[in-house]
Amino acid sequence: MNSQACLLLQKQLKDLCKHPVDGFSAGLVDEKNIFEWSVTIIGPPDTLYEGGFFYAIMSFPQNYPNSPPTVRFTSDIWHPNVYPDGRVCISILHPPGDDPSGYELASERWTPVHTVESIMLSIISMLSGPNDESPANVEAAKEWREKRDEFKKKVSRCVRKSQEMF
């Protein structure tokens, strides 16, 4: 299968292997499926997630790059912008167009110029600075705002658990 999506994903994977980017690594879940990647995100320095190794699956649609991939953490992670099932909720992973809920500008949403690298750097940035205005995990957002010590304890447990799994 030599679709535009396949060729683009093969190129991005090759580029990441040749020129690794600080903060994450990526590879295929199964060598026969270019549309499903396994990524490891290293907790960013000077954040609550520092020292953690968080695993996620990045799934690309057949019409990539016209539609965004989905990213789902398979490691436990406590964060306002990660749904309880692990799905990442950031603007650039939302389909192009206007936001029906009015939280995001069209310019903040997915565009075909985004790459695996830009997505991963956005997720690392999300770990560094949670957005509690439109949370995916309401309980985590509430703790982030009102009970920061509890939030820190839960994140510390996730970091420790990720280190044990590494």
From Swiss-Prot:
Q: Where is the UBC core domain?
A: 4-164
The pathway to which it is assigned is:
Protein modification; protein ubiquitination
Query: At the top level of its lineage, which domain of life is listed?
Result: Eukaryota
Transmembrane region(s): none
Query: Could you tell me which InterPro entries the record lists for this protein?
Result: Ub_conjugating_enzyme, UBQ-conjugat_E2_core, UBQ-conjugating_AS, UBQ-conjugating_enzyme/RWD
Keyword entries, A-Z: ATP-binding, Nucleotide-binding, Transferase, Ubl conjugation pathway
Catalytic activity annotated for this protein? S-ubiquitinyl-[E1 ubiquitin-activating enzyme]-L-cysteine + [E2 ubiquitin-conjugating enzyme]-L-cysteine = [E1 ubiquitin-activating enzyme]-L-cysteine + S-ubiquitinyl-[E2 ubiquitin-conjugating enzyme]-L-cysteine
Q: What induces it?
A: Up-regulated by syringolin, a cell death-inducing chemical.
Which family does the record claim for this protein?
Belongs to the ubiquitin-conjugating enzyme family.
Tell me the protein's name.
Answer: Ubiquitin-conjugating enzyme E2 13
Q: Which organism is it from?
A: Arabidopsis thaliana
Name the lineage. Eukaryota, Viridiplantae, Streptophyta, Embryophyta, Tracheophyta
Gene encoding the protein: UBC13
